[in-house]
Amino acid sequence: MPSSAHLQDAPPLLSRTLTQDEEQTSLRQSSSCGLSAASASESLSGSTKSRIPHSKMLQGNLPRIISPESPAKLPCCYGVIMVLSVAVVALSVALSVKKTPQILTVKTYAACPRNWIGVGNKCYYFNETPSNWTFSQTLCKAQEAELARFDTEEELNFLKRHKGSSGYWIGLHRESSSQPWKWTDNTAYNNLVPIGGDEKHGFLSDNGFSSGRGYIVRKSICSKPNSYTSQCQ
């Protein structure tokens, strides 16, 4: 039969035994928690790894959603854009032209004085008073004109039609038979028609244009410009 002293020492032993059991239980729980955490980590890692290739596989397997009408509509869209661009440029040009003031120059002819005949841009006067070439030029200058000159076929034909049967002094002259013909303002004659003879002064005769001596008296023809320009905006 155990002694009372032995019975009194039992509780400490029991207490120690319980303490060891608790430590073992705690160690088992810690080990279990560690294994659980490791398993969870590996499971999560594996799940993540398995998701990555799966998502890539899904991306590779996803069909491209493109409308079959898109390629056909692209040229049409480009055409519309080009037409609109051209229209915008044309409208811009039209507006700029519209804003720019337009000045129109119109060439008109004034009425010739009384007894003068207008042809083209000149007025002609047939002086029926015979005189030499030099004095005939003086008479023309008194009327702010010169002995007649012609620069076009129209003017030439007019003079031929209206001269009648008489000879008329005109504005051609030269220094000698070897020199070129000039008008009274010393501008060169364009040789529209040849001038016959070897004299220094020209006149209009029945045979066309000829040269004669300046002191011989003849009728004369005067001419002066009648053109002016006016600007209308």
UniProtKB/Swiss-Prot annotation:
Superkingdom of the source species: Eukaryota
One Pfam family this sequence matches: Lectin_C
CDD domains reported in the protein's UniProt record: CLECT_NK_receptors_like
Protein name: C-type lectin domain family 2 member D2
Organism from which the protein derives: Rattus norvegicus
InterPro entries with a match to the protein in the record: C-type_lectin-like, C-type_lectin-like/link_sf, C-type_lectin/matrix_domain, CTDL_fold, NKR-like_CTLD
Location of this chain's protein in the cell: Cell membrane
GO molecular function, one term: natural killer cell lectin-like receptor binding
Protein task: Lectin-type cell surface receptor.
Entry keyword annotation includes Cell membrane: yes
Primary location recorded for the protein, binned into one broad class: membrane
Cellular-component GO terms for this entry: external side of plasma membrane
Record keywords: Cell membrane, Glycoprotein, Lectin, Membrane, Receptor, Signal-anchor, Transmembrane, Transmembrane helix
Signal peptide: none
Keyword Transmembrane set for record: yes
Membrane topology: Single-pass type II membrane protein
